[in-house]
Design a protein with these regions (language model features):
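Glycine-rich phosphate/pyrophosphate-binding loop regions near the starts of catalytic domains
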Residues: 54-143, 147-175, 179-203
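Short hydrophobic/aromatic beta-strand micro-patches
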Residues: 7, 181, 283-287
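Short Lys/Arg-rich basic patches
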Residues: 1-11, 17-20
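Short, basic amphipathic alpha-helical segments that act as recognition/interaction helices
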Residues: 26-48
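Conserved mixed alpha/beta catalytic, RNA-binding, or beta-rich assembly cores of soluble enzyme
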Residues: 94, 107-109, 175-180, 190-233, ...
Length: 309
């Protein structure tokens, strides 16, 4: 048996001595048992307790696409989830087609990309912002909008946000892209959980362009908080943000993704084929008996738009 010398803080030594006295053991015996138990835990309990030693070869990583996200499944039991979005001709510049301030644009860039990643059950770790505009003032305004939106789900943008701007040439139209990288345990991914007889519900109404501004003010569109609320409910099975292809297209992908058919239901006044712009609608497949619970949870327009067959 080898002897190992280690330095420990006084507080830890006080705890060790207290335990030694309580159980009539020597200090070294307490340390030996503590280390033995810890090593046993690392060896046998869950992937999240193991130190991550990524000695991973590319051939060991499986790549899949799920809607607007890419998923890299690692042999460690973890999954890296990436989502991205882009915008052009929307912003405060001279030749932008939709005139909004930079903060508003940043908010919705963050909302779209974060929704896609969070909907899978992954936790966002990194946001990478690439801007085709100057840093000051437009870039700073867009960045501030992203930071505010990130804070709504508990992220610290000063730690997770990377930025790159175009400062070599003057720009007259706004262009921006945002990529979000998240991490999850593979067995906790919220993918392919939809079940036969599930209802497909739409939270929010599809809005695009200038419609989004008024709809946001009137509480008619889905937001990040709603996705987080859905993630916390066991009666919610799969979640998907709707983009430019519309509600019907996204709902069909949810059904086909689990090898099922979709019975489409078109509520009066809701266009299932209209673009939902910057993820103004979120779809969820739910236990049919919990529809009233969902409506009580989220005070937004909620419509049943389909049933999984």
């Amino acid at each position: 048996m080898d002897i190992i010398n280690v330095r420990l803080p006084d507080k830890v030594l006080e705890d060790v001595d207290r335990l030694a006295k309580k159980h009539s053991l020597t200090r070294s015996e307490v340390m030996r048992q503590a280390l033995t138990i810890y090593l046993h835990l690392i060896e046998n309990v869950g992937t999240m307790l193991r130190p991550i030693a990524f000695q991973v070869k590319p051939a060991q990583i499986s790549y899949t696409r799920h809607g607007d996200v890419s998923i890299l499944k690692m042999p460690t039991g973890h999954a890296i989830v990436t989502g991205s979005t882009s915008s052009g001709a929307v912003g405060p510049k001279e030749f932008d087609k939709v005139k909004v301030d930079g903060k508003f644009l940043g908010k919705f860039l963050a909302r779209v990309a974060l929704m896609d990643v969070i909907a899978t059950g992954a936790f966002p770790l990194l946001l990478s912002l690439t801007l085709g505009v100057e840093n000051d003032p437009t870039g700073k305004e867009i960045s501030e909008g992203i930071k505010r939106e990130a804070r709504t789900i508990g992220l610290d943008p000063n730690q997770v946000l990377m930025e790159n701007t175009e400062d070599n040439f003057p720009t007259v139209q706004t262009g921006a892209g945002l990529t979000v990288v998240g991490l999850a345990n593979e067995d906790e991914l919220r993918l392919g959980k939809t079940m036969p007889n599930d209802l497909v519900v739409a939270i929010g109404r599809p809005k695009v362009g200038m419609e989004v501004i008024a709809a946001e003010a009137h509480g008619e569109i889905a937001d990040l908080k709603n996705v987080a609320q859905l993630n916390q409910r066991k009666y919610v099975h799969d979640i998907a943000a709707v983009g430019s292809f519309g509600i019907a297209s996204e709902a069909k992908m949810m059904a086909y993704g689990v090898g099922r058919q979709l019975k489409l239901i078109e509520p009066k006044g809701l266009d299932l084929n209209k673009s939902a712009g910057p993820a103004t609608v979120v779809l969820a497949t739910i236990d049919p008996e919990r529809l009233d619970d969902l409506k009580a949870l989220i005070p937004k327009p909620i419509n049943v738009i389909g049933e999984i067959l």
